[in-house]
Every structure is written in C-alpha cells, then in structure tokens.
Amino acid sequence: MAILGLGTDIVEIARIEAVISRSGERLARRVLSDNEWDIWETHQQPVRFLAKRFAVKEAAAKAFGTGIRNGLAFNQFEVFNDELGKPRLRLWGEALILAEKLGVAHMHVTLADERHYACATVILES
C-alpha cells in the first residue's frame, strides 16, 4: 500500500455561520449529500456540522489533487460514521470514478473541532 494523496483543511466556523445568515440553506444544499442533509436538518448544532463536513470535503479534494472542479462536486463526497463513531468517506459520481482511476483502496479521515475552527485530514491509500 502506498499513499496516493494527502489533504488537510481548516474552516472558521463563524464564516460558515455568516454564509448561512446571508444565503440561508444554499451552502448546505451545495455541500451536503442527501443523507447528510437529512442529519443537518435536525442536528442540534447545524453550523458546526456543516463546517466539519465542509472541512472533510475540502481535504478530500486536496488529497485527490483536483480541488472542487472538472465535474467534482462537494455532494459527491459523503461523510458518515462507522459503528464505532469513526468518520468515514463515501464517494459518488465523478469522485468515485476518479478514485477508481487512481487506484484508491482506502480512505482515512480524521476530523476535529474546537470553539472557532473545524479541521480535517484525508489520506488516500492504494
């Protein structure tokens, strides 16, 4: 196994809150998958939830070396928790096609947040 990509992102939670205040649900609709949206709608801390998901997806896009462009969209990356609560990443559409093309066999996700920031790291492994 070899490391194919590494990406890290940090998000200021207040910036996400400001965008939501200005544009309502537009950012959440653009960033979240349908499954994540369902959780976001009833989450006790929706801004923090969205900030953490945004950080993971930005980190994943960096790990793939593409950013969010050329057919890749935030909602093609879905963050979920396994049975132990560990964050995991599921891919859809162009993101899945790219992962298969690059030979990605494992994706490792770490996620942390404090009062003002959320950060994530994604490692892609063959």
Swiss-Prot record:
SUPFAM superfamilies: 4'-phosphopantetheinyl transferase. InterPro entries: 4-PPantetheinyl_Trfase_dom, 4-PPantetheinyl_Trfase_dom_sf, ACPS, Ppantetheine-prot_Trfase_dom. Signal peptide: none annotated. One of its GO terms (molecular function) is magnesium ion binding. Pfam families: ACPS. It catalyses: apo-[ACP] + CoA = holo-[ACP] + adenosine 3',5'-bisphosphate + H(+). Keywords: Cytoplasm, Fatty acid biosynthesis, Fatty acid metabolism, Lipid biosynthesis, Lipid metabolism, Magnesium, Metal-binding, Transferase. Its main location: cytoplasm. Gene3D superfamilies: 4'-phosphopantetheinyl transferase domain. Its cofactor is Mg(2+). GO terms for biological process: fatty acid biosynthetic process. It is found in: Cytoplasm. Its EC number is 2.7.8.7. One of its GO terms (cellular component) is cytoplasm. Mg(2+) binds at residues 9, 58. It is an enzyme of class 2 (transferase). Transfers the 4'-phosphopantetheine moiety from coenzyme A to a Ser of acyl-carrier-protein. Belongs to the P-Pant transferase superfamily. AcpS family. This is Holo-[acyl-carrier-protein] synthase. It comes from Salmonella paratyphi B (strain ATCC BAA-1250 / SPB7). The lineage of its organism: Bacteria, Pseudomonadati, Pseudomonadota, Gammaproteobacteria, Enterobacterales.
